[in-house]
Amino acid sequence: KMQSTQAMRAIAEHSDKTYTLLYTKHTALKIGMFALERMVQVMEMTQAGMVYADHYQQIDGVQKTAPVIDYQPGSLRDDFNFGSGLLFNANAFKEVIENTEEEYQYAGLYDLRLKISQKSKLVHINEYLYTEVESDKRKSGEKQFDYVDPKNRQVQIEMEQACTNHLKEIGGYLYPIFRPVDFSSHTFEYEASVIIPVRNRIRTVKDAVRSALNQQTTFPFNVIVIDNHSTDGTSEVLRELSSDKRLIHVIPERNDLGIGGCWNIGIHHEKCGKFAVQLDSDDVYKDEHSLQIIIDTFYKQKCAMVIGTYMMTNFDMQEIAPGIIDHKEWTPDNGRNNALRINGLGAPRAFYTPILREIKVPNTSYGEDYALGLKISHDYQIGRIYDVIYLCRRWEGNSDAALPVEKINQNNLYKDRLRTWELEQRILQQETTLEKIQQSIERLFQKQTLSWELAKENYQALKQYRSRTKEISKWFGKQYLDANLFLNPKRILSTTAQTDTASIHSRPCFLCQTNRPQEQEFISYRNYQILVNPYPIFKHHFTIVDKEHKSQSIAGRFKDMIEFTDIMREYFLLYNGPECGASAPDHAHFQACSKEESMQGSYYDHIDLIDNDKVRISYEDFPYSFIRIQAKNKKTMSKTFHLIYDIL
């Protein structure tokens, strides 16, 4: 497969020049005059990892311009349009491939360009440098749903994996930890409001409004229509429908509002309900139960936003391709990360009004819904409904049925910018969070060793014991041992703890939060709690415990252990297995110790087993036996560890 990692490896192996040109189509390519020289020139001027260019497309014998857009950090869509001619810096290409351990069938090229973008620029040359033959003649409104086509599911799984790995590498990944939503924080006259922005939709608005008013619910609701100065008779239709007092017809005083601005008028209306629910003026709800299902989902899934499933129909509401759009690629844990890769989140959308009022809707007529999804999912869980509750009507009057390339580029540029802003916030937030956690850890240690009597006494005692350290030197055969020894009687409880199954079952777990001393405070980090160890061996000694009672096992936790070396940079991490003397083999935990205690510089007799550019593995056999792994990056370290772990 052209897009596979295997294909990328083959290209790297056969590339023996400074630059590598990749053509991604199977049709004829016509290179423009001095086009390759121009691409090389820009590559050298910018030191880019890859350059791409505007071009021409030949469709049914007719040549058309095909401009593309600049690449941004948020240009994470796997279908980002670079055109078919990509010129790579061969060294950058090879370096990425040499360090790539994943094997993708479909996401190889996508993974490659993400990894190149981590170290080098991807530069757009806004000059027309070649002509390609375009065989995909579908309209833009048809192409946009390719990623939700069930036959492409395996492709999307790989693309999500590659994107998620990229986000983790650059600090843009969000772990599945969400802020709770308090639905009792505000009071409302109405439980829900259906929000319908409209301008000049005389053919469809009556269907939309009646669909909303016909909803059967157990709660009071209304319909707020923001009529954005219609001139085709839409306003008159709405006035006729206003005999139903549940319909609120609003004509804004402002004349500079897009769809997002109309939404702001609706959600800030004094009669707006607790939940604001979307209904476009072209569309209708599937039946009279849709609104009830949406509101029930808020309470069941405890979320700040709900997105449903819709079916594409023609004007007469008969199903048309691509049919049902359910966005089953969304997962509760990784949905908000994968949202940076895809171009839409689904419909209909509904929001908890207090949060939406706080965020406010961007005053645009494209992408405002996607912007809200990114913003809300940054902090809150998004709920999903996978049954069809909404009919999206496609007809010649739709604003997005068949767009010219300039409009497509404008839309994609805006969504890429939304993703870039979100990504920049995530990276900055993570850097700030790490700094705050590091400061909090130091404050926790100072506070606990001053105010918690047990910790205070034992750390003071440790200083006294260490002041009586004894040095011993002795030959063991041909090996000479230098050691420092000190007594530490405060650790007697840990070293003599009974760790057999019967003893463990007969005692409460002392690492579980409910069983720990009230004085023992902690810092939460994802699914762990960082505690000051009250029975220290080291000058600064922490225990990092799982929030849940889970058995001590390094399997599946080694990546966490590596991550804590970033969070606690002044410490080294220890893991003591259940069969290696751990006093709490029934509760997963690590130890963190200040680096002045480290064993760096000590002599070990070792044998190198593997030593290459990526990893060094050696066997150390004096004064005790262990395997040392030194790796170029975290991914290689983790993979190497698990290979050895599985063998042992």
Describe the predicted segments one by one.
Residues A28, M33-T65, H289-P322:
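Conserved donor NDP-sugar-binding/catalytic core segment of glycosyltransferases
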Residues A28, D227-E236, N255:
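A conserved acidic beta->alpha catalytic loop
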Residues E103-L112, S365-L372:
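Acidic donor-binding loop at a coil-to-helix junction in glycosyltransferase catalytic cores
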Residues K64-F88, E329-A350:
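A recurrent flexible, glycine/aromatic-enriched loop bordering the glycosyltransferase active site
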Residues E435-D560, F564, Y571-P578, S583, ...:
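Active-site microenvironments that recognize anionic phosphate/pyrophosphate groups
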Residues R210-P220:
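Short, acidic, metal-binding catalytic loop of nucleotide-sugar glycosyltransferases
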Residues D16-K30, G273-V284:
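Short beta-strand-to-loop acidic/aromatic patch adjacent to the donor-nucleotide binding site
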Residues M2-H14, E253-K271:
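Glycine-rich, basic loop-to-helix element that forms the pyrophosphate-binding segment
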